[in-house]
Regions:
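Intrinsic disorder in cytosolic terminal tails and internal cytosolic loops
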Residues: 112-113, 210-252
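Loop-to-transmembrane helix entry/capping segments in MFS-fold secondary transporters
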Residues: 48-49, 153-165
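A membrane-interface helix-boundary motif in multi-pass transporters
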Residues: 182-200
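C-terminal ends and interior cores of transmembrane alpha-helices
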Residues: 88-108, 112-119
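Extracytoplasmic gate region of multi-pass secondary transporters
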Residues: 17-52
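Helix-to-loop junctions at the C-terminal end of transmembrane segments
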Residues: 66-77, 184-185
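Structural signature of the two symmetry-related core transmembrane helices
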Residues: 80-95, 197
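Intracellular juxtamembrane helix-capping segments at the cytosolic ends
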Residues: 139-153
Length: 252
């Protein structure tokens, strides 16, 4: 990145409407998972240990799922992986909602199965499994969006595009706790899952729409690179996985 060129934020949408819109939605999703998720746990009478376990599991799952999702996105149309990941995340938010909202008494099962479900519910095992899977679907969306927008850019614009995407993420991230708290106030603690469902679904639906508007045009030399959601432009520049052969650049 000895030679870099600037790119305006408004131009990012022209280059990749899906990646830009998706990143804006991800800015609402990620802060809600981490910040309002802890509030949700407190409102649901989780112990300090249980809230800590929740944060541990979503962080671990989000990190682990970066690799298989990234692997698939490098071998198939990245938009398809983005859409499937977003919509599967939507389904998981619904399952998370019902895992802590529905009593086994409302389900037409035998008494033995109801006892098993009640035991699982009391220990929140099902919730932890579902929320871990959800984190695995939602947290890699940040890196997927960066990789997808870079599919349409030369390498010298990667850093500038990453900075622009960070700003887009930050704008929505600043308002996410306030919007999410509105849902939790009006729909109860489980309103967080309604909030997450809306933005996950928006990404998937908009992705399907964009596939009808643009054919696949990808940079064959660009690959997915797992990145934390708080990566800085400098961090992108220093990461060898996102860079180019500087020796070759110097020779040219």
């Amino acid at each position: 990145f000895k030679k870099t060129s600037r790119i305006k934020i408004k131009d990012l949408y022209k280059i990749s409407p899906l990646a830009t819109f998706s990143m804006f939605c991800v800015g609402f999703i990620h802060p809600a998972i981490f910040t309002m998720g802890a509030v949700y746990g407190a409102l649901m009478n989780f112990s300090v240990f249980e809230i800590s376990l929740y944060l541990f599991l979503i962080t671990l799952s989000g990190a682990i799922f970066q690799w298989p999702i990234g692997y698939l996105s490098d071998r198939f149309d990245r938009r398809i992986i983005l859409i499937i990941t977003a919509l599967f995340g939507s389904i998981l938010t619904v399952l998370c909602f019902f895992s802590v909202s529905i009593s086994p008494d409302f389900i037409n099962l035998s008494s033995d199965w109801k006892t098993i479900l009640q035991h699982i519910s009391n220990h929140r095992l099902l919730f932890y499994i579902l929320i871990s899977l959800y984190a695995g679907m939602s947290l890699p969306l940040f890196s997927l969006n960066l990789a997808y927008v870079n599919d349409f850019l030369p390498k010298e614009k990667f850093v500038s595009a990453g900075a622009g995407m960070q700003i887009i993420f930050g704008i929505s991230a600043m308002t996410a706790p306030f919007v999410c708290s509105f849902f939790m106030k009006n729909f109860g603690p489980n309103g967080i899952f309604i909030f997450l469902f809306i933005f996950q679904t928006l990404i998937g639906v908009f992705g399907i729409y964009r596939m009808t508007r643009r054919s696949t045009e990808e940079n064959p030399n660009n690959t997915f690179t797992p990145m934390p959601r708080n990566i800085t432009p400098l961090g992108m520049e220093l990461d060898p996985d996102t860079g180019v052969d500087l020796n070759k650049e110097n020779k040219n």
